[in-house]
Amino acid sequence: MKNVIDVTSKGAMSRRDFIGLASVAAFSAVALSGCSSQESAAPEATSMKIGTMQTEDSLPFWVAEQKGFYGDHDVEVEIITFQSAQELSTAFAAGEIDGAMTDIMVSASLVASGIGLNLAWVTLGATPEQGRFGIQTSPESGIKSLADLKGKGIGVGSNTVPEYVMDKLMEAAGASEGEIVNEEIKKLPVRYESMTNNQVAAAALPGSLLALGEATGMITLADDTQGVGNVSQSVLAVRSSWLEGGKAALESVRLAWNDAVAAIEADPEGFRDLLVEKANLPGIVADTDPISSYPEAELPTKDMVDPVLDWMKGKEYLQADVAYDSETGDLKTK
């Protein structure tokens, strides 16, 4: 069930949920790129442009830049930060960037729209503890458990990681499909405020907003770090047309990523200032929000991708049949 709340945003707050909004923009992005799915072969690449939102998932990319790891592996990398999900999706579709830090939903929507891409590696979410999404409510709501949310509106954005996690959490709590009621609120700040002001019974939120809510008295009913398996991943999606000539460059970026992951593991607090700056963490949680561990660069598994594709098909979010090859990382239409 789905309702819609139309509220004007008072501000912007970024986390990887924002990239989930790009799945809606993927189809229009293809139109803006010229509606062409025929991509010419690329010359051998020695550099790479990677697009991202202001999100913790990209910390290793920024650490590699700060520490000079790209130069150590003879590759030039430009990290381009986008202020909106549609801008990121459009730039990827148009070939203005070679890779994007995104999620499986956005990637599948782009592929269904005619954009060839490869899921190069998981940037966050190799384990359930990496990255957090959950359902939060206000203390005035009277909601004490997920069971209390059956039949009540939960603020969420459709075809996003938070919606997927919300469905999994509610299903684990025994809710049927008809008992999960979506209140469509795309903008994260508006969704968060709607929850705190009791305009919705609860909201599906990413980790930074869960932390903000917890710091101000909100109640997290459940999150995906335990109990529902490993259900949320961020990925580096790479354009297939660029990859034709970019395999060596991508391998160099992979090595630099792994160097950055090791550096963060050795001294996570040493990179807090960089994370606060780049991910625009709210001041109230800037000093306390835990710095995640990050995975070494490895392809997403079928167990990560296929359930998401099945969920998208069941929701009719995909306009083409998309399949994942876990041996190569290719995401293609059948």
Where are the predicted features?
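Pocket-lining segment of extracytoplasmic ligand-binding domains
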Residues: 105-106, 182, 187-275
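Short, glycine-/small- and polar/acidic-enriched structural segments
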Residues: 42-176, 182-185, 201-207, 230
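Conserved C-terminal helix/tail region of periplasmic/extracytoplasmic solute-binding proteins
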Residues: 310-334
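Short, solvent-exposed loop/beta-turn-alpha elements that line the ligand-binding surface or hinge
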Residues: 72, 126-128, 226-229, 295-303
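Structured segments of extracytoplasmic/periplasmic soluble domains
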Residues: 64, 73, 91, 95, ...
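Secondary-structure end/capping motifs
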Residues: 244-319
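N-terminal secretory signal peptides
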Residues: 1-13, 17, 22-31
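Bacterial signal peptide processing site
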Residues: 36-38
